[in-house]
Amino acid sequence: MSLNPDLAAYLQLVEAGRSAGKVLPMHALEADEARRQFEESSALIAGKADEPDCISDLSLTTRDGHTLPVRLYRPPQDDPALAGAALLYLHGGGYVVGSLDSHDTLCWNLAQDAGVPVIAVGYRLAPQWRFPTASDDALDAWRWLVEQAEALGIDAQRLAVVGDSVGGSLATILANQLAAQRELAAPRLQVMIYPVTDASCRRPSVQRYGSGYLLEAQTLEWFYQQYATVPADRLDPRFSPLLGSVASNSAPALMLIAECDPLHDQGVAYARHLEQAGVAVQLAVIPGVTHDFMRMGSIIEEADEGLVMVVEALQQHL
């Protein structure tokens, strides 16, 4: 399958900038500069949410006393069939880049199209905060959401967790932790959008799509190195969920995978891993697109198609 032509044209522009020395690959940058450039490119490919009256900035306190930013997106019109339902969103960015702002449009579109509130959390980033900080922050965010549900007008029994890239990793790690611990209300649905599930090895799709398809193999490795405190961290299920056991009562899963993504093979492998544990899985491989396609609504139609799949899964399970 060939690349979507509009996406291919965008990648040609990216490559032209690199060849001219105007843009460096992310793995050649310091973390702060990588974040700045990621935010700039996010504004170009995704745009900006246009309903500020429906968006509120909040905060939560983690187990170690750190304050995390939270953004609440309320839909302009609720879906009566999903009264009280909501979702926690965990953004992507390799544990190093990404923010509430970089995923603002995607979260707003989810809230608007699904007709449910979306709560996005800005977990701490590497290398300043290394493994397992991000997964701890995700669990703390879930606890906060459950505890604040009534005050927010949300039903803690009608929640989903959604994330893209490493946010998808955090989403499934969280869903599995909650299913195993049985301490807090667990999500009714976990949605993983091109997640990282195995940082321990290189699968064939890394060779096929690790250069020239937006997410570079060298950048992926750089992300892993920035987040891991020691190399063995990459074998921990909170880093590589494919390497851990799965609770059979984990939430049903929707997984969206890009065909032309170095993470393709590990995503497919993780879907099978969940199925073998008895978890219901809907796997969709989107042809002709790369990693991060869900944030490319200003470039390709597949972003909207993926959004429809997520909304339909929310309607089915919540």
Swiss-Prot record:
> Where in the cell?
Cytoplasm
Broad class of where this protein is predominantly found: cytoplasm
**Activity control summary:** Inhibited by the serine protease inhibitor phenylmethylsulfonyl fluoride, the histidine reagent diethylpyrocarbonate and two sulfhydryl reagents, mercuric chloride and naphthol AS-D chloroacetate. Not inhibited by EDTA.
Q: How does activity depend on pH?
A: Optimum pH is 7.5 with alpha-naphthyl acetate as substrate.
Q: Name one GO cellular component term.
A: cytoplasm
Query: Main role?
Result: Esterase that catalyzes the hydrolysis of ethyl acetate. Can also use propyl acetate and the chromogenic substrates alpha-naphthyl acetate, alpha-naphthyl propionate, alpha-naphthyl caproate and 4-nitrophenyl acetate, with a preference for short-chain aliphatic esters. Highest activity is obtained in vitro with propyl acetate, followed by ethyl acetate. In vivo, could be involved in pyoverdine biosynthesis, but its specific role and its in vivo substrate have not been identified.
- Name of this chain's protein: Ethyl acetate hydrolase
Species per Swiss-Prot/TrEMBL record: Pseudomonas putida (Arthrobacter siderocapsulatus)
Q: What is the taxonomic lineage of the source species?
A: Bacteria, Pseudomonadati, Pseudomonadota, Gammaproteobacteria, Pseudomonadales
